[in-house]
Amino acid sequence: MNLTPREKDKLLISMAAMVARRRLERGVKLNHPEAIALITDFVVEGARDGRSVAELMEAGAHVLTRDQVMEGIAEMIHDIQVEATFPDGTKLVTVHEPIR
């Protein structure tokens, strides 16, 4: 299987998001990379499902709460920018203050 660097990045993010979901199910608080991966995966999959950029910008800010991440993580992440593939092309989605 020959994957492009972009495809490899998508798979890595997807796998990290799976790990993050399993940890949340066990009640483990997420660290910085896990939180980023989970929100990024949410946006990428939402784009594939046909949701709008505006909808994902809003919904992406409700994927995680402060109680689900380690202390100080919410303050470290101000914006997450995701280049996602929508039915009408690739667009940049910015989620502002993603952990509230």
From Swiss-Prot:
<dbReference type="GO" id="GO:0016151">
    <property type="term" value="F:nickel cation binding"/>
</dbReference>
<keyword id="KW-0963">Cytoplasm</keyword>
<keyword id="KW-0378">Hydrolase</keyword>
<dbReference type="GO" id="GO:0005737">
    <property type="term" value="C:cytoplasm"/>
</dbReference>
<dbReference type="InterPro" id="IPR050069">
    <property type="entry name" value="Urease_subunit"/>
</dbReference>
<dbReference type="GO" id="GO:0009039">
    <property type="term" value="F:urease activity"/>
</dbReference>
<dbReference type="GO" id="GO:0043419">
    <property type="term" value="P:urea catabolic process"/>
</dbReference>
<comment type="pathway">
    <text>Nitrogen metabolism; urea degradation; CO(2) and NH(3) from urea (urease route): step 1/1.</text>
</comment>
<dbReference type="InterPro" id="IPR002026">
    <property type="entry name" value="Urease_gamma/gamma-beta_su"/>
</dbReference>
<comment type="similarity">
    <text>Belongs to the urease gamma subunit family.</text>
</comment>
<dbReference type="InterPro" id="IPR012010">
    <property type="entry name" value="Urease_gamma"/>
</dbReference>
<comment type="subunit">
    <text>Heterotrimer of UreA (gamma), UreB (beta) and UreC (alpha) subunits. Three heterotrimers associate to form the active enzyme.</text>
</comment>
<dbReference type="InterPro" id="IPR036463">
    <property type="entry name" value="Urease_gamma_sf"/>
</dbReference>
<protein>
    <recommendedName>
        <fullName>Urease subunit gamma</fullName>
        <ecNumber>3.5.1.5</ecNumber>
    </recommendedName>
</protein>
<dbReference type="Pfam" id="PF00547">
    <property type="entry name" value="Urease_gamma"/>
</dbReference>
